[in-house]
Amino acid sequence: MLDFITWTADPAIFSIGSREIRWYGLAFAIGFLIGYKIVEKMWKREKLNPAWIDSLLIYTMLGTVIGARLGHCLFYAPDYYLANPLEILKVWEGGLASHGGTLGIIIAIYFYSKRVSHRSMLWAFDKLVVPTGLVAAMIRLGNLMNHEIYGHPTDLPWGFRFIENLHAWKRGAAPVFTVPSHPTQLYEAASYLVTFAICMWLYSVSYTHLRAHETLMNL
């Protein structure tokens, strides 16, 4: 009988010199690309100004990355990053906080609504909320590959043992494993996919039958 799962996935897909190309970054990019295509299809269906969608992508990406990075730096290690502000720019070294990204998106959509669409923030969020679950699921799979954001210890057979000393392990040291823990990355990814499916259905219903603005955000 399986007692636990020993997770030894390498966070990096490959390296170019000293720079690693990581699964997390790939998952993040794929999530955004698929999300963009979903919103693009919604845009065409509703016959909206095509110039607005490219601006929405730019505002959303900037809000997500800047907010997530600042959230990590200021929420988790403010003393270090305030003393070394240039380190904040090193996004490629890792360190993104989802709650910071959420706040960044809200701020970005505020400016998008004021400067581009000239519609309410809820109108923009009504478009973004549909693929958000899918994007979030991809990011959580990236967290799984990074051996991070796992849950409490468990004796359930699907508990994961993650590598604690990733940097040393990458340099050739023997891996040091956590105790078997809940793979909360997978739990969250599954819940986000369910949320995505529900939002897709709600959008289809609201567009086909209700023709109402901001229906999803009101729900």
List the predicted regions and their residue ranges.
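A feature for loop-to-transmembrane-helix boundaries and adjacent hydrophobic helices
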Residues: M1-L216
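Cytosolic catalytic cores of cyclic-nucleotide second-messenger enzymes
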Residues: L219
